[in-house]
Amino acid sequence: MHKELTIENFKCFSEPTTITLGKINICLGCNSVGKSSVIQSFILIRQAFEKARLFKDTQVKKYHIQLNDIYGLQLGDSEHIKSSKVKDDITLKLDEYEYKLMSIAESPMEMEAANEYDVSVQSLREGIFSDGFYYLNAERTGPRNYQMIDSKTINHCGVYGENTMHLLNVLGTVSRVDSERCYNLDEGKTVSTLNKQVEYWMDYIIPGIEIRTDDVLELRVSKMTLRQPALDTDFLSPYNFGFGISYVLPIIVTGLIAERGSMILVENPEAHLHPKGQSHIGYFLAVMACSGIQVIVETHSEHVLNGIRIAALKNKVAPDDISINFFSLKKEGKNTRHMVEKINLDERMNLENWPEGFLDQEEEDLRTLRLLRSKGI
């Protein structure tokens, strides 16, 4: 498990900024304060490692890192993502592994990185250097009647969840889920096949939904239909059920199939979910993290955080295994600086520090309502 990520000269992080990591890591804060930059840093490190692994038996020691169109990255020009014109490189350090990304004059949409480490040794490490690396973009695929089947063998849902239907159809009845990840909140739900465990967890997050998938190989498409047993209808198009199911399904499938010792990056798991569903997806992600997967979550939802805290208390997770990082802007004179503050938890999962702006909007709104009412408005 990785312990520490340091970012320098990348987007809003002009100075070296270190983020402590645990089994499950939550990035919280307002918009445009650096949360997504953390996710992108992991992706750039992963890409540098993959290039080094590809060329490990060659004389190539420096690699071109793509800034766009890989793992969903859309970073644009290399000069635009440096936070300082004085510094030439972007520095990303994960534990003892440090990567310096340099601009390439003739190819501004790429950067050059060297890998000074033994790739064979790195590959034995868990986390970002393991075979399993899973990333789900905030802009996941919405309701679709079908998805195209990738011509390559796939073992993940895809950055946008675009492989989810096919993967579930192929593995649903033949793949067994590790006992630590199996749904354990109902003694009657004990079948460990992937399709049943997906059904159990989906019912926990969005109650009363049944899923059916099928491949039409001659057309190279996977189909999905949904049904609510409470209604007297047959299986229907996903378009009849809104965005929540389509957005959360890849998260559930990814968590259940991810390799032990791997890493999952998830942006906005709460998207299109009711607050109860947001809490429950947080609970699910915490359970996955307890089973030996390092989870990185970028979220705006206090409900996701509370679901994680509930799971941690219920499953006796140590406070140090949960890393809550609050991203904010701090004014210092005429200047504004990006800050990352770790929010500590005690043994009872109480938040030990509560900086200004941290999940306090409800309190602010209630205060405003009281003030307006006192003025007779």
Regions found by a protein language model. Give the residues of each.
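C-terminal lobe/lid and adjacent interdomain/linker elements of RecA-like ASCE P-loop ATPase modules
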Residues: H280-I377
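Short, solvent-exposed loop/turn segments at secondary-structure junctions
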Residues: F10-C12, I26, V33, V60, ...
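Phosphate-coordinating catalytic segments in nucleotide- and nucleic-acid-processing enzymes
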Residues: E4, A48-P250, T254, E259, ...
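Walker B catalytic motif
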Residues: V266-P269
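Phosphate-binding P-loop
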Residues: P16-G22, P229-A230, L256-R260, V287-A289
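Pre-Walker A-like glycine/lysine-rich segment at the N-terminus of P-loop NTPase domains
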Residues: M1-A48
